[in-house]
Amino acid sequence: MFDNIVFVGGIHGVGKSTICQHICRELNMEYLSASELLKWEEINDDAKNKKVKNIPFTQNRLITGLSNTIQKGHYYLLEGHYCLLNEKAEVEKISIDIFIQINPNALGLILGDIREVKSRLDLRDNKNYDFGILAQLQDSELVYAKELSAALKIPLYIEESNDAMNLSNHLSKIYNQK
């Protein structure tokens, strides 16, 4: 569908937005947030709620948002998730079909220390997040990102949040090849 997107994932609170916005400034790419494109605040009573009632519905909204936003001749960094918590607080993979439609040039994954992520989320959202669920979510994102990279035959760059600016170096090589 698209041919000018790099997808960067990571769990809530790992620092994706900050890192991705920095990379976009550095590489003159356009920053896109999956939650903004699918208008999360319109479909959820509590925008800080991390559980998703209908994951396929939200992901279809993402594709619609991308279709209405993406322009030829521009390069985009889309920040989102490989997996989400469903309404039962179970980890659920985003369908590979969604990634096929996004058609990213490369994948990035930002990992973080779960204790730091939990602390950041607890403060930001004024909630007490479950350490085990956050760890399970991050582990699931790592495994699934590797699966997607192999299935889509595109590179995956994995970085720790405290050293994720290396991601910029990897992406600049892809970006400069265009």
Where are these regions (language model features)?
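ATP-dependent NMP and nucleoside kinases share a basic, alpha-helical "lid"
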Residues: 80-124
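Conserved substrate/cofactor phosphate-moiety recognition/catalytic segment
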Residues: 21-62
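Conserved glycine(s) of the Walker
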Residues: 15
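Pre-Walker A (Motif I) flank of P-loop NTPase domains
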Residues: 2-5
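Small-molecule kinase domains that catalyze NTP-dependent phosphoryl transfer to phosphate-bearing small molecules
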Residues: 127-167
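The conserved Walker
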Residues: 12
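Loop/turn-to-beta-strand initiation segments
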Residues: 72-81
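Hydrophobic anchor at the beta1->P-loop junction of P-loop NTPases
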Residues: 8
